C-alpha cells in the first residue's frame, strides 16, 4: 500500500509529486498514457499569466499569483526554459475603455505588480507591429513564457529522483473505498493507497464522482492553435492578448521560448474528453483573431496546428481540497487556464493538505535540483569542440530543422523517465518540432530509440498506444 497515489502525470500531478517527495512518504503516480505530459499539459498556450484575468478572491487568482512568483527560482533549480517577457492586453475601441480599466483594477486588487495602462503611442512603441486599431493596452511586466513540456518533465524527473514511482500505461477504471484508504482498479491490477490525489485533468470529475455524493462536472473546452516557423520569430516580443470575454482570454499571439510564434486558442465546449482534433472553422478563427492584433503575421509560415482540451469546471474555479465525504481523497480538479502558471502553487497546496493528514517527517535526502538535457547550442565554440572530442555523438546532427544531435536524443531516452516514443523524444529535445515536422529525422530517431532501449523498431510508436509507425521491415534491420 502506498501512502499517496496521484492520478495523472500532467503538470499539476507532477508538481504535486515533486512537492510531496520532500516528505518521507511512499508515493506513486499513475498515468494512463505512455509518458508524462500527454494531456492538457502538452497542448496549451505555454504562458505564465500575470494573474490579472482571475476573479478577485478566487483560489484561481491566489494560485496564479503564487505560481507566477515561484517560476524564476524553479526554472533555475529544475533547469527548464522560462522567460519573463511581459504581456499586453489590447483595447481596440474607446467604447471598451471602461472594461479595460475594470480589468486593470481587478489586477491591482489581485496583487499583480507593475501594471500600467498605455495609450496607443506607448503600446506601439513597445510593440511596433500591433494593429493601428489599438487605442490602449494594459502592460503586465510579470507575464512570461515557458516550455510546458520541459516544465512538466522537470517536475516529474525531480520527483522520480526523490523516490516517487511512476506507473505508465496504467488506466484507473474504478476507485473503491476501503477501511485503510482506497483501492484503484486498473487494467494492470489493483493499487492500494491511504490517500489519493486526483489530478486527472478533464477526467477529474469522473474520479471525484466515484467516491463523493457531491458531484462535480467538467466540460472539455477545446482550444485550437497555429504554430509559425522560427523564421517568423521577432514579430512580437510580448505576449499579446485581446480583452477577455465569456469563454476566456481569447486568441493570443506570443513568442515561444524557442523562437516560434504561437497563435490561439479557440474556446469550444464539447463532450468528447479525448477530442483534440482541429477544425477548419476553428483555425480560421485563430487566423482572423490573431491578425487583428498583429496584421503582419506571416500566416504562410504556419508549420503545424494542434488542439488541446481545458478542464472547465462548471463553477469556473479550481477545486483543490480534501473531500468532506471522502477523507484522504484530495481533488486537484477544474485546472484550466491559468493552470500551467499555477502548477507550482497547486503542488504546494496539495502537499500542505497531505502534510496535515499524515504529519510526515521531512525527507532529509531531498534533491532540490535537476539538470536538463545538455543543449550544445548554448556552448561556446571551444566548449562544443571539447564536448565532441569526449562524446562524438554530440557532433552528429539528427534533426536538421532544430539542429538536435544524436547525443541529446540518447540522453532523452536513457535519463530517468526516458522517452519511449517519437513524441517523447520531441517533447524532451525538439527533434521533429521544426519546419519539416519530423519528415527527415523520424527514421533515424527511431533507430536511436530502438538501439538505446534494446527493442525492435516495430515496437516504437509515435505517441504510445496504437500509434504504430512501422508494421514490417523490408530489410534485415533492427
Where are these regions (language model features)?
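Helical element adjacent to the flavin cofactor pocket in flavoenzyme catalytic cores
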Residues: 138-195
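C-terminal catalytic lobe of FAD-dependent flavoproteins
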Residues: 248, 257-258, 274-397, 404-417, ...
Amino acid at each position: 500500500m502506498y501512502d499517496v497515489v496521484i492520478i495523472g502525470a500532467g503538470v499539476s500531478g507532477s508538481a504535486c509529486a515533486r512537492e510531496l517527495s520532500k516528505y518521507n512518504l511512499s508515493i506513486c503516480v499513475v498515468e494512463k498514457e505512455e509518458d508524462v505530459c500527454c494531456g492538457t499539459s502538452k497542448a496549451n498556450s505555454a504562458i505564465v499569466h500575470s494573474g490579472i484575468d482571475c476573479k478577485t478572491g478566487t483560489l484561481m487568482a491566489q494560485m496564479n499569483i503564487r505560481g507566477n512568483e515561484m517560476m524564476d527560482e524553479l526554472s533555475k533549480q529544475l533547469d527548464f526554459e522560462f522567460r519573463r517577457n511581459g504581456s499586453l492586453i489590447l483595447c481596440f475601441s474607446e467604447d471598451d475603455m471602461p472594461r479595460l480599466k475594470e480589468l486593470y483594477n481587478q489586477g491591482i486588487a489581485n496583487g499583480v505588480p507593475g501594471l500600467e495602462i498605455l495609450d496607443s503611442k506607448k503600446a506601439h512603441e513597445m510593440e511596433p507591429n500591433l494593429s493601428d486599431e489599438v487605442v490602449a493596452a494594459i502592460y503586465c511586466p510579470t507575464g512570461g513564457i515557458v516550455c510546458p513540456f520541459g516544465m512538466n518533465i522537470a517536475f516529474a524527473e525531480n520527483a522520480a529522483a526523490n523516490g516517487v514511482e511512476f506507473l505508465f500505461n496504467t488506466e484507473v477504471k474504478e476507485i473503491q473505498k476501503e477501511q485503510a484508504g482506497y483501492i484503484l482498479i486498473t487494467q494492470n491490477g489493483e493499487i492500494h493507497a491511504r490517500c489519493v490525489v486526483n489530478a486527472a485533468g478533464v477526467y477529474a470529475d469522473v474520479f471525484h464522482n466515484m467516491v463523493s455524493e457531491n458531484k462535480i462536472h467538467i466540460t472539455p473546452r477545446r482550444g485550437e492553435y497555429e504554430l509559425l516557423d522560427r523564421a517568423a520569430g521577432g514579430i512580437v516580443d510580448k505576449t499579446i492578448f485581446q480583452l477577455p470575454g465569456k469563454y476566456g482570454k481569447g486568441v493570443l499571439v506570443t513568442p515561444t521560448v524557442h523562437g516560434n510564434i504561437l497563435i490561439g486558442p479557440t474556446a469550444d465546449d464539447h463532450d468528447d474528453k479525448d477530442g483534440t482534433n482541429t477544425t477548419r472553422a476553428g483555425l480560421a478563427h485563430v487566423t482572423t483573431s490573431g491578425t487583428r492584433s498583429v496584421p503582419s503575421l506571416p500566416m504562410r509560415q504556419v508549420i503545424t496546428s494542434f488542439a488541446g482540451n481545458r478542464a472547465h469546471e462548471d463553477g469556473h474555479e479550481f477545486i483543490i481540497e480534501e473531500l468532506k465525504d471522502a477523507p484522504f481523497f484530495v481533488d486537484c480538479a477544474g485546472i484550466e487556464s491559468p493552470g500551467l502558471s499555477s502548477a507550482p502553487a497547486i503542488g504546494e497546496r496539495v502537499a500542505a493538505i497531505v502534510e496535515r493528514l499524515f504529519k510526515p517527517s521531512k525527507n532529509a535526502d531531498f534533491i532540490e535540483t535537476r539538470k536538463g538535457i545538455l543543449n550544445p547550442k548554448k556552448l561556446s565554440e571551444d566548449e562544443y569542440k571539447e564536448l565532441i572530442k569526449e562524446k562524438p555523438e554530440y557532433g552528429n546532427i539528427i534533426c536538421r530543422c532544430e539542429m538536435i544531435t544524436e547525443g541529446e536524443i540518447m540522453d532523452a531516452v536513457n535519463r530517468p523517465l526516458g522517452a519511449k516514443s517519437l513524441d517523447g523524444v520531441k517533447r524532451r529535445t525538439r527533434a521533429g518540432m521544426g519546419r519539416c515536422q519530423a519528415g527527415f529525422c523520424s527514421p533515424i530517431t527511431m533507430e536511436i530509440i530502438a538501439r538505446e532501449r534494446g527493442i525492435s523498431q516495430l515496437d516504437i510508436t509515435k505517441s504510445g498506444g496504437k500509434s504504430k509507425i512501422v508494421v514490417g521491415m523490408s530489410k534485415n534491420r533492427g
